[in-house]
Amino acid sequence: MKYDIKLRFEVEGIVEKTDVIGAIFGQTENLFGDEFDLRELQDKGRLGRIIVEIRTKGGKSEGEIIIPSNLDRIETALIAAMVESVDKVGPYNSKFELIEIEDIRAEKLKKIIERAKGILSSWSKEKSLDIKEVINEISSAVKVGEITEYGPERLPAGPDVDKDPNLIIVEGRADVINLLRYGYKNVIAVEGATSRIPETVVSLSKMKKTVIAFLDGDHGGDLILKELLSNNVKIDFVARAPVGREVEELTGKEIAKALSNMMPLTQYLKKIQEAEQAIAKNVIAKEEKPIQLEATQQLVQITLPQNVLEEIKKLPGTLEGVLYDNNWNLIEKVQVRDIIPKLEAYEDNKVAYIVFDGVITQRLLDLASQKNIKMIIGARIGGINKRPQNVDILTFTDIISS
């Protein structure tokens, strides 16, 4: 069928469906000859079965009619007008009125188009092959076995830190794991040292032909380099992750690019000094009003359940996170890379606390504020320009050392 003729009707009395159908056939018969006789058209398959829905209300009958039509547009319009001319059903006066003529093919086409859009959308959302994830999965079986603990401080390190003439120094265990994943085995971590670099790193650096400090692309990386130099660690070259990125999250290509762009220490320090001088001159040249700086660190007092404390001790180096509800009940364990999409999928107020082995970033803080998350506990705090008032943040060091 091409069209559905839809009409509504009212009858000044109580009638049955058969009465309505009989009135339609009877009062349209021979109006335009046999060619437009409804029974003949039904027999030839040009019209479908008449569908009647009827209701009684206050001694009257009302309802809707659908007449499927396989005629052309002009003939279908004529049939609709013929049915509208029916003014009696049985002994009662009646009124038939056209609601619409629905183009079934157009509606079917709309449904097909909408379905095609849905198929395309779900197809686009399907996980495409991510080479990094493939490498991660393949290497996960060996990465834990390859990582070693070096020196009396039990520092995370690759298996070749002793025998390789070159050494890569990174900040934390997660950085070591990521470099091992891509085949860099001459790597050792200072474990986020901010005041005293382990003596093992100092002595090991002096035994190596070339030492590379490979650090995060944020202020934290600047601080680690400063501590390395102030503790007399031998540094020959400096490599940095892209601005705002962490070594632990880089792909193999990004690691290779960062290391290929490393600079000799003297050249790097000169570049930094020139940049600082340029900034200083620019600031002096401008007359600016004093700016009131907000305190960036707030005192957070909270009692953590024992099971959460135990979980925090296990997380470093796993690149995993845990989501808790308002009562510190476990909601889900996730990979660090999946935390933001997971949070976006949850309803507001569902997650109250996040504990994860990763960097607390501005993007994560903004999303947490939007989702009414109370607290984030992470491995480190990245470059944060604006701290939401409704989200407390702590690091593993804050928890474990307290």
Curated annotation (Swiss-Prot):
Keyword Magnesium: yes
Cofactor(s) the protein needs: Mg(2+)
S-S bonds: none
GO cellular component term of the entry, any: primosome complex
The reaction(s) this protein catalyses: ssDNA + n NTP = ssDNA/pppN(pN)n-1 hybrid + (n-1) diphosphate
Family that this chain belongs to: Belongs to the archaeal DnaG primase family.
Protein's UniProt name: DNA primase DnaG
Source species of the chain: Saccharolobus islandicus (strain L.S.2.15 / Lassen #1)
Lineage: Archaea, Thermoproteota, Thermoprotei, Sulfolobales, Sulfolobaceae
